[in-house]
């Protein structure tokens, strides 16, 4: 998908998140503009890793570009958690509204809305931090002996190395693999 339509789509999804969470947060905390700023930064920086793909040779000469690349990738991770959790919150609120409308549940909307919005932000941020820490830690090495019957003598002692779930790219490079 070309970058411009993708950028517009992700910006619109950020607007959706803002419309669903910020009004509820405004009734809970005066710090809600911080969430608005973070959403705006996320919307603006998410396209950066795709734009900078064509400028890989310049990265060593431009550390600011590398930093923006990282910010964009971190924004993507945070946005994905935030978007999914916002959808889950909306589904939960819809089910609570239906239960309330049918008379089976008394919902304290003045508490449920704001606190669930805050929970979405807190969970998305926490999950993103955990994901970032796990992605940056050194991958574990596990040695496994696999006996193979009928292996030719020429292959005795042969070692096979398998790298699993290590995605070498703009954030995980050769130095990480060498650790």
Predicted regions and their residues:
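Non-catalytic terminal accessory segments
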Residues: 1-139
